[in-house]
Amino acid sequence: MQGIIIKGIAGFYYVKVEEEIYECKARGKFRLGELSPIVGDKVDITVINGKGVIEKIHPRTNKLIRPPVSNVTQAFIVFSIVNPEFSSDLLNKFLILCEFNNIKVKVCINKIDLVNEELLTPIKNLLNNTGYELKFLNAKSKIGINELKESLKDNITVVCGPSGVGKSTLMNSIAGSNVMKTGDISEKLKRGKNTTRHSELIEVAGGFIVDTPGFSSLDLNFIDRYELKDLFPEFYEYNGSCKYSTCVHDKEPGCEVKKAVEEGNINIERYNFYVDTLNKLSVRRNYK
């Protein structure tokens, strides 16, 4: 049978197969090798007397480290304009990480009750021509929540963003009573409350949402300098148009991306962040 791991606690994995959930252990070959099952994995299992064994882990489309979860297809990147104050650099880092992991994005601006339309203009300009969906929410009063719920279908969604923007409130508004506290899980599964617990997939609206926020580390050092340009979707239409095929859209003459910035077709703040990140990668990787 094929299913998906929705929970992992102390060496036990809970695999959802259609409408059933099976408690499984992993074959020793996984424990001895470098590949260990994690939440989000698509797996083949055999079940004998109601107990399952994971026989195969299917290839992953991606793997997040914090939290450890695989095959994530969608991210709700949550920010506020005030309380805490919006940071375009921080948002850009989240966007790069999602692009790198091939995760589609919805940028969610929470606490819109605290701002007026004028304060929302900079974020709209920042994301102009990027293709990213921009949603305005008030998670406490559930404004905009239904639309997000509709996008959960057939996705594994992670919620991420800086501290204090209302990620937990948003997740509770979306998942409602489906969200289980650690103690509840421990009681249900008859395991100790201090048992090591990893992420869990909560089933909502025909999809899954990861119950712990994603991307706790925003380090970009692992990205190749020459691949950075591929993580900015507003650059795509200029691929192959620059004078030099190796153009990284920095100081080269005949760069169509720089021309687009000058003409206002690419947001200059996003471009400046790109150049700054490019230069940091150059120094760290000794490309200069």
From Swiss-Prot:
First-level EC class: hydrolase
Q: Which GO terms describe its molecular function?
A: GTP binding; GTPase activity; metal ion binding; rRNA binding
GO cellular component, alphabetical, reads:
cytoplasm
PROSITE patterns for this protein: ENGC_GTPASE, G_CP
Chief place where the protein resides: cytoplasm
Cellular compartment(s): Cytoplasm
Where in this chain does the entry annotate a coiled-coil region? none
Listed under GO biological process in this entry are: ribosomal small subunit biogenesis
Q: Which cofactor does it need?
A: Zn(2+)
Outline the extent of the CP-type G domain: 61-218
The EC number on file is 3.6.1.-
Keywords, in A-Z order: Cytoplasm, GTP-binding, Hydrolase, Metal-binding, Nucleotide-binding, Ribosome biogenesis, RNA-binding, rRNA-binding, Zinc
Subunit and partners: Monomer. Associates with 30S ribosomal subunit, binds 16S rRNA.
Q: Which PANTHER family match?
A: SMALL RIBOSOMAL SUBUNIT BIOGENESIS GTPASE RSGA (PTHR32120), SMALL RIBOSOMAL SUBUNIT BIOGENESIS GTPASE RSGA 1, MITOCHONDRIAL-RELATED (PTHR32120:SF11)
The record describes the protein's role as:
One of several proteins that assist in the late maturation steps of the functional core of the 30S ribosomal subunit. Helps release RbfA from mature subunits. May play a role in the assembly of ribosomal proteins into the subunit. Circularly permuted GTPase that catalyzes slow GTP hydrolysis, GTPase activity is stimulated by the 30S ribosomal subunit.
What is this protein's name?
Answer: Small ribosomal subunit biogenesis GTPase RsgA
The species this protein belongs to is Clostridium acetobutylicum (strain ATCC 824 / DSM 792 / JCM 1419 / IAM 19013 / LMG 5710 / NBRC 13948 / NRRL B-527 / VKM B-1787 / 2291 / W)
